[in-house]
Amino acid sequence: MVSAARGRRPKNLPIDSSVPDDIDWDHIPNHIACVMDGNGRWASRRGLPRTEGHAAGEVALVDAVDGALALGVGWITMYAFSTENWRRPADEVRYLMGFNESLLMRRADELNEKGVRIRFAGRRDWRVPRRVLKRMDESAELTQDNRRCTLTMAFNYGGRAEIVDAVRALVAEGAKADKIDEKAIRRHLYHPDMPDPDLVVRTSGEHRISNYLLWEIAYSELVFPEVLWPDFRREHLYESVLEFQRRERRYGGLES
């Protein structure tokens, strides 16, 4: 278990009265990764098109980032569009492409003002419209010097695809089999400097990984709140962090 000492909130963090009093400031996860699940079910329960669920999820994303900033989390990664999502109906895929483009148009300046660096992880293949790639590049360039928090949007991303791409890059370099180890593969991941997630939060109560950050989450703590993503708020993020703090991370070792 974590230490009974709760630490003190760093003075440089914004004051958020909704942060629980029992948060242990000495054990804040450095990297939180979120699977934003439940948009379709949220919409269906309200008799709305699935696309309305995706639209409603924007507020949840921004509030989760604000919550991460209030805790001093250095990295937060959002599963925005998976390599498997291409199998969804064409109308929904088109909507998601346009939605993510417009989301960046609406939110990039706001996130930049908050000191958030925006990055993207995933394949930049022919299926992703050029206008979307352009907007991604513009957002990344705008925020590249920010260091308060890094928001990585996993877009056209798959954990297996990332590992395959890393191995392909090694082969293309002419790497010999006996020289390929974990360090070599990590150097060829989409963002080698990104620390492994300490905490993975998947909303909607589903207990699955869904091909997300397979290499990086080997020793992550997993939390599965029942709330659907559009209803997710920073209070749910704080509850997930409290659950994380109640656990002892062993990394394959024995209980201390």
Named regions from a protein language model:
Residues M1-S256:
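Flexible, compositionally biased loop and terminal segments
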